[in-house]
């Protein structure tokens, strides 16, 4: 009689910031073969494991499968297991709205909600117009991996803005105690012009105020005595 055993282990550092996958194989309670993702190949621990290691290390698809298990097994199990929130890695998303073209009322346009640097991957992004959810004209990219285990996604809304419309990007994520909302308000060209004029007037006012204070300061100082001899002609 003999007993063959397999143990698959996952080790986590700071949530899933770093994952290590270990595959251990035993014959009659003696470990004879091991795969460690930090090593990247099978290593024989006894003479019995030598032929296994040589065979499996020569098969590229087997090694690729073992490397993929960090995501397909370890990461998946971590995210699906009921781990206490205090032990999970959570990264809050950054949310911003941008317009694809210069704003013009009553013209077709595209609003882009950029949601970046969040973890875990599960996230819900919705668009609202004047408090009502928009379901048509919504297009989303696939989740994009940043390379540091965090993710980003773009959710776009095709729209034709009317004066006074308020568009809201609404984001739900496990890292948030309450949803994050970012608003974008449609403005007429005259309103934008008035706003820009107001900003320009404010800037000019600050410049003239500073110039006036400078001149007043110079006058208050007055003459500082006669010039040195030889400078008066």
Curated annotation (Swiss-Prot):
Disulfide bond sites: none
One GO term of the biological process aspect: antigen processing and presentation of exogenous peptide antigen via MHC class II
Main location as per UniProt: membrane
Keywords of this entry: Adaptive immunity, Glycoprotein, Immunity, Membrane, MHC II, Transmembrane, Transmembrane helix
PROSITE patterns: IG_LIKE (PS50835), IG_MHC (PS00290)
Subcellular location as annotated: Membrane
Domain Ig-like C1-type: 93-181
Cytoplasmic topological domain: 216-233
SUPFAM superfamilies from the UniProt entry: Immunoglobulin (SSF48726), MHC antigen-recognition domain (SSF54452)
Pfam families associated with the record: C1-set, MHC_II_beta
Region annotation (Connecting peptide) ranges: 185-194
Membrane spanning residue stretches: 195-215
Beta-1: annotated span: 1-80
GO CC annotation terms, alphabetical: cell surface; late endosome membrane; lysosomal membrane; MHC class II protein complex
Stated role: Involved in the presentation of foreign antigens to the immune system.
Family under the similarity heading: Belongs to the MHC class II family.
Name recorded for this polypeptide: Rano class II histocompatibility antigen, A beta chain
Originating gene: RT1-B
């Amino acid at each position: 009689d003999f007993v063959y055993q397999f143990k698959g282990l996952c080790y986590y550092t700071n949530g899933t910031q770093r994952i290590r996958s270990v595959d251990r194989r035993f014959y009659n309670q003696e470990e004879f073969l091991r795969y460690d993702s930090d090593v990247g190949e099978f290593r024989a621990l006894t003479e019995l494991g030598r032929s296994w290691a040589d065979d499996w290390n020569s098969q590229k698809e087997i090694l690729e499968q073992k490397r993929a298990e960090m995501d397909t097994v370890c990461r998946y199990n971590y995210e699906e297991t009921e781990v206490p929130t205090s032990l999970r890695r959570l990264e809050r998303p950054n949310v911003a709205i941008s317009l694809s073209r210069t704003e013009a009322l009553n013209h077709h346009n595209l609003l882009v909600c950029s949601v970046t640097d969040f973890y875990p991957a599960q996230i819900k992004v919705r668009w609202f117009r004047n408090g009502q959810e928009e379901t048509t004209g919504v297009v989303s990219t696939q989740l994009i991996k940043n390379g540091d285990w965090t993710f980003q996604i773009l959710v776009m809304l095709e729209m034709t803005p009317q004066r006074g419309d308020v568009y809201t990007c609404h984001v739900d994520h496990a890292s948030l105690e309450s949803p994050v909302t970012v608003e974008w308000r449609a403005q007429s060209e005259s309103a934008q012009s008035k706003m820009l004029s107001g900003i320009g007037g404010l800037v000019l006012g600050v410049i003239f105020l500073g110039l006036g204070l400078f001149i007043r300061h110079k006058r208050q100082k007055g003459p500082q005595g006669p010039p040195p001899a030889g400078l008066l002609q």
